[in-house]
């Protein structure tokens, strides 16, 4: 690949024995082979997108279809060999089951004939005469399409071409516009087949779509809370930190209490009949246990680290001073989040198209079935890897851009005259020279996350069996991969900052950063960890308030929903939004301390080699060193006292 800018050897690479550690003016492209590999991978993704558009039929999934291959609410093309296909269903938007009270699933296929109708019968129809009257008055024909309403009561085999009597009253369901019977006996049987025996994807979509307004409102709430939290960290004081920690403690305890109360309410509800409601109850128990454990761990950590609050406030104020030199850094997550949303919507659309890609086959009675095309399962895995890798690449680009901005501002001698447009300068360096480095770092995260996903699937599969040893092994492996993921993310962030300084490739940058930080870790490790912990608590606060709103909202929508899945989706989205906004502080903090380590490595504070850090940052570091020295002295004195032998006078 040809670089988009001038290609020169860095001064740091001319002297391999000693790194110069200065922002380079002349750079070269790094990790170009990885960028080419990413380009080839995306060529495959574009092919899958084109294939899904050509072979998929998302309308069948979103709007529903009848037994003859017609999508309800659409104008359809005929299927060869199916005389009742290819009809105009523009006015017939509802899916009606002719035998809704006796549904069965045979070979992953409903036993009842399905039709598209213009409206669902809201009153019970006991005879064919009433079915005929309903068709004439409402224009909704409940018998097969080739039977005229006049013949409903005339031909002898009309009962085989019309719905089984009596036809129960029904209402349209939000997802697929299905006509759902309202009588208790039919409702239980219908729901147990339609929801409990349908595949997981449709059940999850059912819960999300039926509560889509609530999900959207909660996502907006999470967005607003994340903005508020970001500005809270921007103008943080000691009082705000104490209020913030108090809100965290109250929020955690409150959410735990509400979860246990809802679980108790479900266990004493005698009207629960559906498996989906029982799944909601199990999910509530799981949420309650997990939230209780997380609350206990966080409360212990808050108690242990309470003495570091004042230093943490000073640390965040130093971070805010670095951000004030380039205040548009706070808006960096907005465009990153917008790009992620666009990519996720595109990914879901392609996934839905892949899920509906199938060849129409005519079976007995002129009905139509859709058989999945070969190769779809491999495309699905490829598509999933594309989701993880591309999402990590977008987030890594933000990390590199923020780190480059911090580096530019930190290594500026004249603090009163900040550099012009540091964010645009950092972005231009990223896209011209270091995209390959970002691709390589995001690929390492992807390699770790895919086995985690597979192990989680294996663990969930083994939960229903008696393999206790297998479950334990898979869970331990998941924990190991989680720890590896966290370590890699921290290593990647420092590697991106080093690349922004020296212009070196990913492996060289990671090695240099690790070596430099290990030499200077005593200066800032503890306070940096607590700063990251406070930022993490900010994310937890956003999730707590959003989940509480979701619990109150979804608790009133128990009918025909797996509402535990939308609640989990809302919690994940809330954490993701909070992470997108607050990660700017984490990135600035990590980049700032790496620049500080570089400053200590290359300068000594003399007139010949003055520090790049300002006086406020230097005073903060001195206070940390004094506290660390005092703590070490106290520890040594306690050790010596314990080892002293008491002798008689």
UniProtKB/Swiss-Prot annotation:
Determine if Glycoprotein is one of this entry's keywords: yes
Topology of this chain in the membrane = Multi-pass membrane protein
Q: Which Pfam families match?
A: Choline_transpo
Segments spanning the bilayer are: 33-53, 213-233, 235-255, 284-304, 334-354, 384-404, 533-553, 562-582
Which GO annotations describe the biological process of this protein? transmembrane transport
User: Where is this protein primarily located?
Assistant: membrane
Glycosylation sites (chain numbering): 136, 151, 414, 502, 520
Record-level Gene Ontology MF annotations: organic cation transmembrane transporter activity; transmembrane transporter activity
Q: Keyword annotations for this protein? A: Glycoprotein, Membrane, Transmembrane, Transmembrane helix
UniProt KW Thylakoid keyword:
no
Q: Which InterPro entries does the protein's record reference?
A: Choline_transptr-like
Localization per record = Membrane
A single GO CC term for this protein reads: membrane
* Family note: Belongs to the CTL (choline transporter-like) family.
PANTHER family per the UniProt record, alphabetical: CHOLINE TRANSPORTER-LIKE (SLC FAMILY 44) (PTHR12385), CHOLINE TRANSPORTER-LIKE PROTEIN 3 (PTHR12385:SF13)
Q: What is this protein called?
A: Choline transporter-like protein 3
**Which lineage do the record's taxonomy fields give for this organism?**
Eukaryota, Metazoa, Chordata, Craniata, Vertebrata
């Amino acid at each position: 690949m040809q670089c988009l800018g001038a290609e020169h050897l860095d001064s740091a690479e001319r002297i391999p024995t000693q790194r110069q550690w200065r922002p380079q003016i002349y750079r070269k492209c790094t990790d170009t082979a990885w960028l080419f590999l990413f380009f080839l991978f995306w060529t495959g993704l574009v092919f899958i997108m084109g294939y899904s558009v050509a072979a998929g039929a998302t309308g069948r999934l979103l709007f529903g279809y009848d037994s003859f291959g017609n999508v309800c609410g659409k104008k359809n093309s005929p299927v060869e060999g199916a005389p009742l296909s290819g009809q105009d269903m523009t006015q017939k938007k509802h899916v009606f089951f002719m035998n809704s009270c006796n549904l069965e699933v045979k070979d992953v296929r409903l036993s009842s004939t399905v039709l598209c109708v213009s409206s669902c019968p809201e009153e019970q129809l006991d005879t064919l005469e009433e079915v005929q009257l309903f068709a004439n008055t409402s224009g909704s024909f409940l018998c097969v399409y080739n039977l005229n309403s006049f013949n409903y009561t005339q031909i002898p085999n009309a009962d085989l071409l019309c719905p089984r009597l009596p036809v129960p009253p029904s209402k349209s369901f939000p997802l697929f516009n299905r006509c759902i019977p309202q009588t208790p006996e039919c409702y239980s049987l219908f729901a147990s087949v339609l929801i409990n025996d349908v595949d997981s994807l449709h059940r999850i979509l059912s819960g999300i779509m039926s509560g889509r307004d609530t999900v959207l409102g909660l996502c907006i709430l999470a967005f607003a809370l994340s903005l508020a939290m970001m500005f809270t960290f921007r103008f943080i004081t000691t009082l705000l930190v104490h209020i913030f920690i108090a809100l965290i403690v109250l929020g955690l305890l409150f959410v735990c209490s509400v979860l246990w109360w809802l679980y108790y309410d479900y266990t004493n509800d005698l009207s629960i009949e559906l498996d989906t409601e029982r799944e909601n109850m199990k999910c509530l128990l799981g949420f309650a246990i997990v939230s209780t454990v997380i609350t206990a761990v966080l409360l212990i950590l808050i108690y242990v680290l309470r003495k570091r609050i004042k230093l943490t406030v000073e640390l965040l104020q130093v971070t805010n001073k670095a951000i004030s030199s380039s205040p548009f850094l706070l808006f960096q997550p907005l465009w990153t989040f917008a790009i992620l949303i666009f990519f996720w919507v595109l990914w879901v659309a392609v996934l839905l198209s892949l899920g509906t890609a199938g060849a129409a086959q005519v079976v007995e009675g002129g009905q139509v079935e859709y058989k999945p095309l070969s190769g779809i399962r491999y495309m699905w895995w490829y598509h999933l890897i594309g989701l993880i890798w591309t999402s990590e690449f977008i987030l890594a680009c933000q990390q590199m851009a923020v780190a480059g901005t911090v580096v530019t501002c930190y290594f500026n001698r004249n603090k009163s005259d900040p550099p012009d447009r540091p964010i645009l300068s950092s972005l231009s360096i990223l896209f011209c020279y270091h995209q390959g480095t970002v691709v390589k770092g995001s690929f390492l995260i992807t390699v770790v996350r895919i086995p985690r996903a597979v192990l989680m699937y294996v663990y969930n599969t083994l939960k229903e069996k008696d393999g206790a040893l297998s479950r334990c092994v898979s869970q331990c492996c998941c924990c190991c991969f989680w720890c590896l993921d966290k370590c890699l993310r921290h290593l990647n962030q420092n590697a991106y900052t080093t690349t922004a300084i020296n212009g070196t490739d990913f492996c060289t940058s990671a090695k240099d950063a690790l070596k430099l930080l290990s030499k200077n870790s005593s200066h800032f490790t503890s306070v940096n960890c607590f700063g990251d912990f406070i930022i993490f608590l900010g994310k937890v606060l956003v999730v707590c308030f959003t989940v509480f709103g979701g619990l109150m909202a979804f608790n009133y929508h128990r009918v025909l929903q797996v509402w535990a899945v939308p609640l989990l989706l809302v919690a994940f989205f809330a954490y993701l939004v909070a992470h997108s906004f607050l990660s700017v502080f984490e990135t600035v903090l990590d980049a700032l301390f790496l620049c500080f380590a570089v400053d200590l490595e290359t300068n000594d504070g003399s007139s010949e080699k003055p520090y790049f850090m300002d006086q406020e940052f230097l005073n903060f570091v001195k206070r940390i060193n004094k506290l660390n020295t005092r703590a070490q002295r106290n520890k040594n004195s306690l050790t010596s006292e314990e080892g002293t032998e008491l002798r008689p006078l």
